[in-house]
UniProtKB/Swiss-Prot annotation:
Subcellular location: Cell outer membrane
General function of this protein: Together with LptE, is involved in the assembly of lipopolysaccharide (LPS) at the surface of the outer membrane.
Start and end residues of each stretch annotated as Disordered: 26-208
Organism: Nitrosospira multiformis (strain ATCC 25196 / NCIMB 11849 / C 71)
Record-given protein name: LPS-assembly protein LptD
Length: 929
């Protein structure tokens, strides 16, 4: 019995020891952060696992428990089925599906410590919340001490490579692990990781050995600031080996990603301590669209310095590419290429190439700087410079523009080298040296300024010594607008040339060579409101002109205004009566070297009573026009202070009808707008009055509905006439856009018109009829045509007609006809036509049927390749002196780099309505020695 008791007690003692031993093998359930707190099954499934990558040195370390080193070496790969992610349930079907693994390694900045038993032990607590199988190969390296993070691998059923991450692909779902994996080392399901920043409602955790949470927060803040300086580093490869604290080697389809930087190669090494990366075999570096490829790479992720051997490169912003013997990384977005090439042509097309001994690309400023540059076009060297600076983004920058070449019959061969100075974002300057074989050297300057309340432009050209005339010749043009505040604004205009033939000798377009009066003016204006809807304006100006005379067709020099003060005031609905009151007036002192001088005072008060509703209006108006002259003694006139007073009465009325209609399957709104305008002005003899500024206006719809057919204030017509006008418009119902407008007008005078500009005055009683059509006849054909007829003789007095055919961008045909009886008779045809993706022609012919000569002729051809364009244009221009000049333009444009030769684009855009530039969308600036 005693023996049985002793035996039973022994068995109980043995069982107690075994139970204690088993108890010792379980993780303790204390509050210490080393063990963590297990969450009951089912709780926290919806709560995210927060990982503080800042405090975790290796996301793929795990504690191997009691496994021996030999057990760790027993397997080199991990089956995807053995991975258990938090909050995932087991999938029995997944156990029998092996997959080829790819090892991943994630690095982030570590917190350095002096002790392996202190903070290092704490950091090991923050491993990724993932349960891993035990059969993992231990990588070569020093044995990990207790608490020190060790490298571990991660496998996925469908590995999401870093390149897939860059493309934004969603990761494939990983099969759920078997339930047998639940007791393996790792964090429990739904467990919060100690040390992350606590959000509202999070349970506060303390690191081992720490008692004050404030100290924890301070350490976390310091660690977070350190992490901000360097993005986490992710490494993916077929096989990883090495040690987290030292060097990691990735073998087979290796990929490294750190922020926007992405590197891939066949083989790669990464040292976390120094942040150095080395890669060999099919190296590819990507950053924000830039792609660099080479054979060997050495790169520091922190300093962004290193080198890439035998690289090819493609820049996203510039759409450029090239090759080099060596590429040096010299900091963030700074590349230096040695023995390099540069082009914007696509791969396989080297139509033009910059061959450079040393090329530096500043990817922040988008500027390239090259040394010892040779430019080849179609394998033919066309330019060499020891130094070049260019923008590959199209933005403004200081530097030399590409030289321009050209030829003209009056200037000879030309070469111009312009320099652009980008002084500030709101003002710049361009200086150009222009060498002409027949004229010598010309210096051209342009300055532009744009301020918040002002803007300016200055042109200054000089030929120090014209080889033809042996004189100094020059031109200046300046304008400035300025808002002074409080309703005041000012404008200055000054234009002058050294002689009357300057534009004929140096101009290259008809508008320039036919200029006759160059404006010189200073203006000060004051504007304010009168009540809610009234206006008040006072203007003062000083004005004169430089008149460029044609020896074969002399013109009268305009009067100078020294000065002129004008007043305009308008007040609608005065005192709520519905009456609109208007007052206009001026005082002007006119000066002329050969004609009558004097001053003129003009006052024109008027009142109108507009009546309007939804379908029409009627507006009676009455005014009194008063004019007084002070001609002074010796003016050669019969009266020194003549005056004129004229009452003016008008009645304007109109109706508006509309209807819905369908035309060609489209829905339109058609309007019908009849209008009747009557004006009465009694006759007053005006022969004794000087004519300072009056001229006859061109007959048009606007002039038909005006009270005076003369401009200025010296001549006021006698009138007792009525104008009938009818307008119909076709509006798109969906957008309200006007598709077509038709209008006819007839002016009927009840008296003989006795006031004319001629002396002696003649009677003019001819009734006038006008018709006009404008808009789109079809989606591709538009017109703007007007006719004025003499109904007595059934002859056209004025014809203006223009038709344009534009089926698509780059294809346009224009035809124009202009006729004014006894004045001009011209035809004008122009075209830009793209025959293929690359070839197009341009042409213009402006011919005078009255003079039987070509006013302007132009013909050219353009070839647009994908990365370069070539333009050749011939221009024949008739000058105001009945002489002519011929110019040739030849330009080679290298897309994204420069334009070489004389630029015909300004001539083409002015001469051919609807011309659009095809090929390059801009060229850069170059800067030379």
């Amino acid at each position: 019995m005693k023996l049985r008791f002793i035996r039973s007690a022994g068995w109980l003692f043995l069982l107690f020891c075994l139970a204690c031993n088993a108890r010792a093998d379980l993780p303790p359930l204390s509050s210490k952060p080393e063990q963590g707190r297990a969450t009951p099954s089912g709780e926290g499934d919806d709560k995210p696992v927060v990982i503080d990558t800042e405090r975790i040195r290796g996301h793929h370390e795990y504690e191997s428990g009691t496994r021996s080193e030999s057990e760790l070496r027993s397997r080199s790969t991990i089956s995807t089925d053995q991975i258990k992610k938090p909050n995932q349930k087991a999938d029995p079907a997944a156990k029998d599906t092996p997959s080829a693994p790819q090892q991943n390694y994630t690095l982030s900045p570590a917190i350095k410590t002096d002790s392996r038993t202190g903070t290092s032990a704490q950091e090991s607590e923050k491993a990724e919340s993932m349960v891993l199988p035990g059969g993992v190969e231990r990588l070569p390296g020093p044995a990990a001490e207790e608490g020190e993070p060790r490298l571990r691998t991660r496998t996925q059923s469908a590995p999401r490579t870093l390149s897939a991450q860059k493309r934004g692909e969603k990761p494939a779902k990983t099969p759920a692990p078997a339930e047998a994996d639940q007791d393996r080392p790792g964090f429990a399901e739904g467990e919060r990781i100690g040390g992350h920043r606590e959000e509202a409602g999070d349970e506060k955790l303390r690191l081992a050995g720490e008692t004050e949470p404030e100290a924890i927060e301070q350490k976390l803040a310091e660690a977070e600031a350190e992490t901000d300086k360097q993005s986490p580093v992710f490494v993916v490869a077929d096989r990883l080996q090495g040690h987290v604290e030292e060097e990691i080697e990735a073998i087979g389809k290796a990929e490294l990603s750190a922020g926007p930087q992405f590197i891939s190669a066949e083989r790669m090494k990464y040292n976390q301590g120094t942040n150095d990366a080395e890669a060999q075999g099919n190296v590819r570096v990507e950053k924000e669209g830039d792609i660099l490829e080479g054979s060997d790479l050495k790169f520091n992720l922190l300093s962004k310095t290193g080198q890439l051997s035998e690289p090819s490169y493609r820049l996203k912003d510039a759409s450029s590419r090239g090759y080099a013997g060596m590429l040096l990384f010299e900091g963030e977005n700074q590349y230096r290429l040695q023995k390099a090439s540069y082009t914007t042509c696509p791969v396989g097309d080297d139509s033009w190439v910059l061959q450079v001994a040393d090329l530096k690309l500043d990817n922040d400023k988008k500027v390239g700087t090259a040394k010892n540059v040779k430019l080849t076009f179609k394998d033919v060297p066309i330019l060499y410079t020891p130094w070049m600076n260019f923008s590959y983004s199209g933005e403004r920058k200081s530097g030399l523009l590409a030289p321009t070449y050209g030829t003209g019959s009056r200037t000879g061969l030309e070469l111009a080298v312009p320099f652009y100075w980008n002084i500030a974002p709101n003002y710049d300057a361009t200086f150009s040296a222009r060498l002409m074989s027949k004229r010598g050297l010309a210096i051209n300057n342009e300055f532009r300024f744009l301020g918040q309340n002002s803007s300016s432009n200055l042109l200054a050209d000089i030929v120090p010594r014209d080889l033809d005339t042996q004189t100094t010749r020059w031109r200046t043009s300046f304008w400035h607008n300025h808002y002074l505040g409080a309703g005041f604004s000012a404008r200055l205009d000054y234009n002058r040339v050294s002689d009357a033939t300057y534009f004929r000798d140096f101009g290259n377009n008809l508008n320039l060579t036919s200029r006759t009066n160059l404006l010189q003016q200073g203006l000060l204006s004051y504007n304010r409101g009168l009540g809610d809807d009234g206006t008040f304006n006072v203007t003062s100006l000083v004005q004169s002109f430089q008149t460029i005379q044609d020896p074969l067709a002399a013109i009268v020099v305009p009067y100078k205004r020294l000065p002129q003060v004008g007043l305009n005031a308008n007040k609608p609905d005065v005192f709520g009566t519905g009456v609109d009151v208007n007052l206009s007036g001026s005082w002007t002192n006119f000066s002329h070297p050969t004609l009558v001088n004097g001053s003129r005072t003009v006052l024109f008060p008027s009142m109108s009573y507009p009546l309007r509703n939804s379908f029409g209006f009627i507006t009676p108006k009455v005014g009194m026009h008063y004019t007084r002259y002070s001609l002074g003694e010796g003016a050669g006139v019969s009266e020194e202070n003549p005056t004129r007073t004229l009452p003016i009465f008008s009645l304007d009325s109109g109706l508006a009808f509309d209807r819905k209609m369908s035309l060609g399957g489209e829905s339109f709104t058609q309007t019908l707008e009849p209008r009747v305008f009557y004006v009465y002005v009694p006759f007053r003899a005006q022969d004794q009055l000087p004519n300072f500024d009056s001229a006859k206006t061109d007959f048009s719809f606007a002039q038909m509905l005006a009270e005076n057919r003369f401009s200025g204030s010296d001549r006021i017509n006698d009138a007792n006439q009525v104008t009938f006008a009818l307008t119909t418009r076709l509006l798109e119902s969906s957008t309200g856009r006007e598709r077509l407008r038709l209008a006819v007008g007839h002016q009927l005078s009840f008296i003989d018109r006795r006031i004319t500009l001629e002396t002696p005055q003649t009677i003019d009683r001819r009734p006038d009829f006008i018709a006009a059509v404008s808009g789109f006849l079809t989606p591709t054909i538009s017109t703007d045509t007007s006719f004025q007829f003499d109904q007595t003789r059934l002859l056209a007095d004025v014809v203006r007609s223009g038709v344009s055919y534009r089926p698509e961008p780059g294809r346009v045909l224009n035809f124009g006809y202009r006729f004014t009886r006894d004045v001009l008779h011209q035809v004008d045809a122009s075209s830009q036509w793209r025959w293929s993706e690359r070839w197009q022609t341009v042409a213009r012919l402006n011919y005078s049927l009255q003079d039987k000569r070509i006013l302007e002729g132009l013909a050219g051809v353009e070839y647009n390749a994908c990365c370069w364009s070539l333009r050749f244009v011939l221009q024949h221009l008739t000058l105001a002196t009945q002489k002519s000049t011929t110019a040739a333009f030849l330009q080679l444009e290298l897309n994204g780099l420069m334009q070489i030769g004389s630029n015909p684009l300004t001539v083409l855009q002015r001469s051919i309505p609807g011309y659009i530039r095809t090929g390059s969308q801009g060229s850069g600036l170059i800067e030379g020695p």
